[in-house]
Structures are given as C-alpha cells and as structure tokens.
C-alpha cells in the first residue's frame, strides 16, 4: 500500500518542524520529523493500526512519545495522510 500526503498534511509537518527549530533546535526538529515519517511509513503495512477517526471514514494514529496525531484515510491501495495535529489542537 502506498502513502500519499495531502498538501495540508505537508504544510502541517513544515509548521511543526519550523516551530521546533525556532523554539528548540534544528536537530530536534529533524528528529521529530524523522519519527513522524517512520510512524507514517508503518501505515503502509499496518493501515488499520490507528483508532477510528472522529470524522467518518478517517483513522487517527497517536504518535508514541510525541504530542502529535496523524489523521488519515485508507482506500484499497493507498493511505492518504490528511493532517498532522498537536494533541492540544481542537479537532475536528
């Protein structure tokens, strides 16, 4: 199964990385981005590992050790990454 990022999700990752780099360090930002990519990469093999989403036809993956949530949709041949959200953000 392939992973496809929406423009919104890509923007979310950029904002997360920029925030961490500004308020922490570049290496911390790269580490968080790598952890997010690794967790999302596992969705290609285990697309149902996240819980049922709060919006119909979505799933939500809580990232272990990070305060972030991945909102995604699964189809026959693709996992579509819809959003990356901080756990404190109101969703939906």
Predicted regions, residues:
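Structural motif corresponding to alpha-helix initiation and N-cap regions
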Residues: 55, 65-66
